[in-house]
Amino acid sequence: MAIERTFSILKPDATARNLTGAINALIEKAGLRIVAQKRIRMTREQAETFYAVHKARPFFGELVDFMISGPVVVQVLEGENAVLKHREIMGATDPSKAADGTIRKLHATSVGENSVHGSDATETAAVEIAQFFSGNEIVG
């Protein structure tokens, strides 16, 4: 099994409800290490760049507005098959369809306010990590 890194964001709905510790506990229980973490307020430009892949979708503006509505926690996670493992513990985008015990089943309030983002591939993770962290901020 390969040791990988993936990128995670605890979204404004999660930080507003002080869920950082609870979500981090689920991440660590799944065997992933948090090797970088910081609480930030995304700028509109950062959010638009980060979600540029969705620019043509009807929900893009609402997504950007949500992501800049409050603080987020950006993270780099490390572990065996980190991308897949993190996606499994996040659960389905729609919390009503998420498996029991997943972050979204436990904490998300809707499809839009689903508490967490996770990279979908190692290549995507590398790009997303570089958008928010410099090399010396990642201590693995």
From Swiss-Prot:
Residues annotated as catalytic: 117
Keywords linked to the UniProt accession: ATP-binding, Cytoplasm, Kinase, Magnesium, Metal-binding, Nucleotide metabolism, Nucleotide-binding, Phosphoprotein, Transferase
Entry EC no(s): 2.7.4.6
Chief place of localization: cytoplasm
Domain of life: Bacteria
Gene Ontology annotations for the cellular component aspect, listed alphabetically: cytoplasm
Alphabetical GO biological process terms: CTP biosynthetic process; GTP biosynthetic process; UTP biosynthetic process
Reactions catalysed, as given in the entry: a 2'-deoxyribonucleoside 5'-diphosphate + ATP = a 2'-deoxyribonucleoside 5'-triphosphate + ADP; a ribonucleoside 5'-diphosphate + ATP = a ribonucleoside 5'-triphosphate + ADP
Localization per record: Cytoplasm
Gene Ontology MF terms: ATP binding; metal ion binding; nucleoside diphosphate kinase activity
Binding residues annotated for ATP, in chain numbering: 11, 59, 87, 93, 104, 114
NCBIfam families: PRK00668.1 (NF001908)
Xref: HAMAP family: NDP_kinase
Primary role: Major role in the synthesis of nucleoside triphosphates other than ATP. The ATP gamma phosphate is transferred to the NDP beta phosphate via a ping-pong mechanism, using a phosphorylated active-site intermediate.
Assembly description: Homotetramer.
Protein name per Swiss-Prot or TrEMBL: Nucleoside diphosphate kinase
Source species of the chain: Nitrobacter hamburgensis (strain DSM 10229 / NCIMB 13809 / X14)
